[in-house]
Amino acid sequence: MVELKKLQKDVYQNKVNHGFNTTDLNKEFCLAYGELGEAYMAWLRKKDDLGEELADVAIYLLGISEILGIDLENEILNKIEKNSKRVYKEVNGCLVKDKE
């Protein structure tokens, strides 16, 4: 399996190779948000390209992480561990954090 760090570097290099944005983080976050919206619409409409739309979201997250120098794989692993230790309570039918 490919490591996320390698994917981050590959995504960033593809941006450089094609002359895509690598400096305007506001733009990158907006584009990632747009891709998430496209994924949501694909899911609502039960379109066959949902997986591709989710891949677009992941690609933007990988690119943003590389631009910012964040090891996304490490952050994900740490967050999964943190979430596994959280205590939740139900409030109005929704689970919310009670304790870290």
Question: Model segments located where?
Answer:
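Flexible "arm" and connector segments at domain edges
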Residues: 1-100
